[in-house]
Regions:
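Short, positively charged
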Residues: 137-162
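DNA target-recognition patches
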Residues: 37, 43-80
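A structural connector/turn signal
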Residues: 81-82, 161
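Non-catalytic DNA-recognition/assembly elements of restriction-modification systems
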Residues: 1-49, 180-211
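A short glycine-rich beta-alpha junction/loop motif
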Residues: 119-125, 158-182
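A short beta-sheet element
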Residues: 95-145
């Protein structure tokens, strides 16, 4: 069944975006709650020089279902040959290329420890989200970003030809429901514990395999 959206010229924004995917996805974004852009900042700081040469680099294939595959990133043998974004503990990485494939992960403090003090970097295909409130955990956003409704919006929002991407503006306009915001501190604590357990289990499994 076909669908259509009517927009005035003023609603198209500065870029005069005519891609139907943008507006069909935007139609799903309305509702109560806080726009993601009011909860996070998008950082684009680059890693350069010696830091880049020795950095642990996370590619989009290293992020899935909230967890970073640190062991796979550490196995990379060749130094980075292109620009990379700096990553800090507490950041939330969202692939702008394939978030609908669940390429989303939280950077726990234990990830920094596992990197042995080396700088952490990621592909420029990630949106690097940091909390607007210093020290706040963004773990509570994982079930929302990985939920069926949000995943459907992200899948519909892709724009472009050979490598379609999700627009930053649409991602930041998506609304986090009030109920989740009210319990975010407790929810983040539970999710961080579960993520730490999952990372520990993955680390133990890797050691057994490599023996």
């Amino acid at each position: 069944m076909s669908a259509h959206v009517v927009r005035t010229l003023a609603e198209l924004g500065d870029a005069i975006t005519l891609a139907p995917e943008r507006h069909l996805a935007t139609r799903l974004v309305s509702g109560d709650g806080a726009p993601l852009g009011t909860l996070v900042d998008v950082r684009s700081e680059r890693v350069e020089g010696d830091d880049l040469a020795h950095a642990v680099v996370f590619d989009t294939t290293h992020a899935r279902d909230g967890i970073l595959d640190v062991r796979a990133a550490l196995r990379a043998s060749a130094p980075p040959s292109s620009a990379k974004k700096r990553v800090h503990a507490g950041d939330l990485l969202v692939s702008r290329l394939r978030p609908y494939l669940r390429q989303i992960a939280l950077v726990l403090p234990s990830v920094r420890t596992a990197c042995g003090g080396r700088a952490m970097a990621c592909s420029t295909e990630f949106y690097v989200l940091s909390p607007r409130t210093p020290g706040e955990s963004l773990a509570f956003l994982l079930p929302w970003l990985l939920g069926d409704e949000t995943q459907a919006i992200l899948a519909a929002a892709q724009e472009g030809g050979h490598h379609p991407r999700v627009p930053r503006e649409l991602l930041l306009s998506m609304r986090v429901e009030p109920e989740r915001l009210r319990v975010r501190k407790a929810l983040s604590a539970r999710l961080e514990r579960a993520l730490r357990d999952a990372l520990d289990a993955r680390r133990r499994l890797s050691r057994l395999i490599e023996e």
